[in-house]
Amino acid sequence: MKRICIAIAALPLLAGAGQPQWRADSRPDADDLRKEIAATPEKSGGIYFAYPVTADDEVTVPEGFEPVFLTHYGRHGSRWCLKDYQYAMADSVFAFLQRTGNLTPLGLDVQQRLLRIGQHAKGHAGELSPLGERQHKAIASRMAARVPSLFADSTRVEARSSQVPRCIMSMAAFTERLKEINPSLKVQRHATPGDMEFIAYDSPDAYTIGSRDAPWRRMERQMRDSLIDPTRLLASLMVNPAGATDSLITAVASTYSSKKAPGKEKKDAPRLNGRQMQQQLMKVLHDIAVDIQDVDGLEDVTLLDLFTPEECFNLWQMLNLDMYYRHANAEGNGQAGMNSARHMLQRLIAVADTALAQPGKPDVPVQLHFGHDTHLIRLLALMEVEGCSRSEGNPARYCEAWQDFRVSPMAANLQVVFFRNPQGRVLTLLRHNEQNVSLPIPNAKEGAPFYEWTALRKYLVSKL
């Protein structure tokens, strides 16, 4: 029996020493999640959670089997906040409140923190951070060490990326590390419009379910009103929160109208009343707070201290609700997001078929794909990877069924590794965030955690 074992050094990230809490294979209750997020409030950022440190699972490969092919889908690594207006909105609101004398001492202090954060982020919205590059280099190192024969000599590696720069930079960091390990590798990189049909495909139904006017948004608003109470936070920041409502609406509207991107239509400000605008400000402050973990140079700055543990938990619930309903397997969503992943699943099957049809070592033993959180979430749900596809119909329990920070933190990934013996039998190993995972396929296991490829392929084709 052969063992593939990777020891991962402890790094100063956020998962917590010795806590494999990122795993998606168990269903915690709400109280457990409250405690988990209170212990690590960075997790309240959901998909903003930085790739966690884990001990890689040890794998014992059955005797006589050798690695023959590997394919993967990886989310881009840690980045700055997605949109400039997130920083601009906070700056605009606090500048107005400061001019009108409506900031408490804490509010004035927070304004200075926001100015520093905004200056740090200027020109970088949505961009891969240096931490994001390091995440992908580390994953590449572990991958190459796990199956070194696939990265030996002048092996050909093909890498394909979404056309979005943070994905291209993630691909560059990953493949650069592979070349550092073995300069003889022949690496081909692609970021072309045609590849977007599988790397980042959005069906018409997926667009519809994501619209502001989609019917499920009423449920979302009801949940927000029941969970998000900005009263305490705003009272800590403003001398007269009630008197600031009109200024909030004006400041936010002006932020949207001033952020027209070249060549794009102006984004309309959301139609929100005073209470909703207060909730929006709370959300934006939280968005900025949780993104600090994803960048270098702000280690001595925090905004998470502004929120109570319960506020962090509730803000996370709303982020999680949105991702779960639009992209995973929530009851009533018509599986619109999941079905968009069929193109990527078809791609994974096709590249495996091509590689395995060749005797001996394939022409391209490694096929890498770099894309986005939503598309990985959809793929994992479509495949029914453990912990990633539970169906729940009660919005109050979405958080128990599915947790975005487990399923798709920054740099999340799915790896599929194929092993073949001299008789031509093929076994398959699936890894989610570098941990062994299972699929609901009866009688397909050769022995945990391996699947017979013939049974696995039949199962995957049934999802198309």
Feature map (PLM): residue ranges:
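Bacterial Sec-dependent N-terminal signal peptides
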Residues: 1-24
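Signature for phosphate-centric chemistry
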Residues: 20-156, 162-367, 371-464
